[in-house]
Amino acid sequence: RIEDTIQELVNLYGSRAVIVVICGNNAKLKESLENQCKGHPNVIIQGFTKKIPLYMDACDVLFSKPGGLTSTEAAVKGVPLIHTAPIPGCENRNAAFFARRGMSYYCQEPAQQAKYAKLLCENQFLRFRMAEAQRRNTNAGSAEEICGLLRQAVGSDEVTSCMF
């Protein structure tokens, strides 16, 4: 539960860290977390935003369920990543894929998630090693490569750009 992870982080860091939680369109979760985090000015609860890339750039550690899009975006950006509780099925496989390659830590226990965050924040070598594993295992230029393959497949240079 995200509520438990937030509490573990608050217990571990107190006011020494800013914790930003992005709830997307989940208004019920946002309201619940706002109520839980009253009195903790260093915990920011955010609803839907189009500024996810900026938040990722600013964060020291990203907690996320192991969905493909957020996980891949974090890996391409070299953001230290802790995968939390997956939705059964492909997210289990995503978490295992990332963790086996050193691209994330994977843990469903909130206390352990907080400990992993502390390790990543305090140990530059661990952050570097994870970012290096992410770099080795992702291709930031894959969209352009796909466009090139599409150009070859249609036998035309009329495909000038791809928007994703």
Model regions: which residues?
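Donor-nucleotide binding loops and adjacent catalytic segments primarily
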Residues: R1-A58
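Short, glycine/polar-rich helix-capping loops at beta-to-alpha or helix-loop-helix junctions
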Residues: L29-L33, T70, G89-A95
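Acidic donor-binding loop of glycosyltransferase active sites
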Residues: D57-P66
